């Protein structure tokens, strides 16, 4: 799961706005029972139980109140996770485009095209190195798991 430092500037600003909205007394804290409302407002879906466990973990003194930093750390777990899922979906799409026969693998020349499309500054040597690292068995093909491992590793 994510950490607060993985949040984008926009996400931090969005969380700050939401936090301030629920910090009615401007004490710099929100009540832990507000957290699920805020997360839902931000379009997050989650299991209540997971949220309760997280709150217990973050609100260590059991005060029932969270400061902005604590709230951010908690929200990051949900927001960053969603980004990771979205990224995985995009990578799956990229993989599918090249796996035209739906065999579950692509050949290394297709992989080279994908890598070049993602980063046009890569040299041929760097591409060769990356491919050698992924295609560890030298089969000339890369399956989706190997591909994901390389892209997210």
UniProtKB/Swiss-Prot annotation:
* InterPro entries reported in the protein's UniProt record: CALM/Myosin/TropC-like, EF-hand-dom_pair, EF_Hand_1_Ca_BS, EF_hand_dom
Residues recorded as bearing Blocked amino end (Ala) in the entry: 1
List of residues binding Ca(2+) 3? 135, 137, 139, 141, 146
Question: Any signal peptide, and if so, which residues?
Answer: none
Name the UniProt key words of this record, in alphabetical order.
Calcium, Metal-binding, Muscle protein, Repeat
The organism's place on the tree of life at top rank: Eukaryota
The record's CDD domains line, in alphabetical order, gives: EFh (cd00051)
Task: Give the record's GO CC terms.
Answer: myosin II complex
Q: Which residues bind Ca(2+) 2?
A: 99, 110
Annotated residues for binding of Ca(2+) 1: 59, 61, 63, 65, 70
GO molecular-function annotation terms?
A: calcium ion binding
Domain EF-hand: start-end pairs = 10-45, 46-81, 86-121, 122-153
What is the role of the protein in this entry? Troponin is the central regulatory protein of striated muscle contraction. Tn consists of three components: Tn-I which is the inhibitor of actomyosin ATPase, Tn-T which contains the binding site for tropomyosin and Tn-C. The binding of calcium to Tn-C abolishes the inhibitory action of Tn on actin filaments.
Query: So what family is this one in?
Result: Belongs to the troponin C family.
Record's protein name = Troponin C
């Amino acid at each position: 799961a994510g950490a607060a430092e993985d949040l984008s500037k926009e996400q931090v600003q969005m969380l700050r706005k939401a936090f301030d909205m629920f910090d009615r007394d401007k004490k710099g804290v929100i009540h832990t029972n507000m957290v699920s409302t805020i997360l839902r407002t931000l379009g997050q879906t989650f299991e209540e139980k997971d949220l309760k466990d997280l709150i217990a973990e973050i609100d260590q003194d059991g005060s029932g109140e969270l400061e902005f930093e604590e709230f951010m750390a908690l929200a990051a777990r949900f927001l960053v996770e969603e980004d990771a899922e979205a990224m995985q979906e995009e990578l799956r799409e990229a993989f599918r485009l090249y796996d035209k026969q739906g065999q579950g693998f692509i050949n290394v020349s297709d992989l080279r095209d994908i890598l070049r499309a993602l980063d046009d500054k890569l040299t041929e040597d760097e591409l060769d190195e990356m491919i050698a690292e992924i295609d560890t068995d030298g089969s000339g093909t890369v399956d989706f798991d190997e591909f994901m491992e390389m892209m997210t590793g």
